[in-house]
Amino acid sequence: MKLMRVRKGVVARAAERWARYRGERRLAALMLLMVFVGGPLAAAQENINEQVRALREKLLLDAYRPGYHFVTLEGRCGPFDPNGAIFWKGRYHLFYIFQDHRGHNWGHASSIDLVHWRHHPTGLVSGMFSGNCFINKDGVPTMCYHQTKQGNAMAVALDDNLDTWKKLESNPITPKTSEGDPHHGKYRSWDPYGWLEGNTYYAIFGGKRPAIVKSESLEGPWKYVGDLMAHTVGDVDINEDVSCADLFKFGDKYMLLCISHRLGCRYYLGQWKNEQFYPEFHEKMSWVDNDYFAPESLLDDKGRRIMWAWIFDGRKKKTRNESGWSGTMGLPRVLWLADDGTLRMSLPEELKVLRYNPKTMNNVTVKADSELTLKDIRGNSIELSIEMVPDGAQQFGVKVCASPDGQEETLVYYDANDKKLKIDTNKSSLGEGPKSVEAGPFELKGGEALKLRVFVDKSVVEVFANERQAVMRRIYPTREDSVGVVLFSKGGSVKVPVLKAWDMMPSNPY
């Protein structure tokens, strides 16, 4: 009987996991009924196995499921905000929002190399929305998160694998206020970010007119300090929405990574002093829409500041649901502050382990107003490293995922006319998906070569230029032959001293 109870428990957990796979609780209930009302145990187990295999096979064959970008294993993740990122005991830990019948939960994965990820049991469930992880006074990882309807909250880790957490009995740390409360209207209990400074805990409470609260103890009492922002900067209003906040020391400055639901992913550079943030500079990290969203970062043992963001699936909701999954993150970006006080960004060296089948071209010239198809370089899971020196060219770059007749193609290029790095997806697909031009401000200085790193991963194109700018788009080509790579130049010629290409090994299990 004991063995039977154990096996029933295994099937019960498998059934619940399948409910997450498909979002179909009725199927899980049917499987449980087969077990507990006398149905054959072996048949129920085999039925589950077959369904799981079928889903895995479906995901393996999905033409738009990225191979080396971090993706959800299965099911609906919208939003798919990265949360609680922390480097702990030699491992990178990344939490993320997913949805099931309980509502919003935090999934969890860890890695030692930022490439291969082990998925952990779901330990933070029901009512978990955006938040972060920091080390408390006792040296224990602590989550500060939005507890949906209840307000902002805290939880502490109970093991070094960060699998088990205890939510504070004093949660929420600061309740939502109502009419008549002395602090009503001064802050919103939303998208918190917590940290320890000296002997004091601080937290940003996000939303419009974001606030600072503080306490000497995690359990409180928490006190309202005042506005996060000391003043405005540029044309950004002091009341601009600050959500998914991430504040940290950055060189001789502080960086505030965040989003607003109007401006998308963005950042401030400035100073943290007198319990306020004094912004000096503001820039966006997405421009045409909010498809690059909800940034989250950590500091690792090498001193690297590494960030992730959710990249949105732009297909119709019905299409996303039928695919059996939805949730992709951008490649991890290493951020640092240059000597001139501006942001620099690149990729972790660890990603190079995915490269294979290297190809190199040297001293190529693309004539004015012409194209050059690279016959030996093609694919939809590749990395390109291209150095381009313009000679009068006004628009020059590379087309990826291009069909032979040009019906489908995605353009990656520098536009000297408006000094921007662009991805044009207007011809990326004959089917659905956003048609737009993403354009990030970027200027080549006199005589400077354009140094592109282009990552194509099925439905994702990410581009890095001269370690100063990055842009991203989702694409959904419909043709099997939309795998071409084409150099192009307009308004003048361009020289390509060196072009390197690699196929990229998938790191996701399916």
Model regions and ranges:
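Bacterial N-terminal signal peptides that target proteins for export
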Residues: 4-29
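Bacterial N-terminal signal peptides
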Residues: 28-39
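Boundary at the C-terminal end of the N-terminal hydrophobic targeting segment
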Residues: 42-44
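Surface loop/turn signatures of beta-propeller and other carbohydrate-active proteins
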Residues: 46-84, 115-135, 162-196, 221-246, ...
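Beta-rich accessory regions
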Residues: 52-56, 272-277, 282, 286-290, ...
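Hydrophobic core segments of beta-strands in well-ordered, beta-rich domains
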Residues: 80-99, 120-122, 130-156, 173, ...
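Repetitive beta-architecture junctions, highlighting loop-to-beta-strand starts
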Residues: 104-106, 150-153, 208-210, 220, ...
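Conserved Ser/Thr-centered positions that define the repeating blades of beta-propeller domains
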Residues: 111, 155-159, 212-216, 270
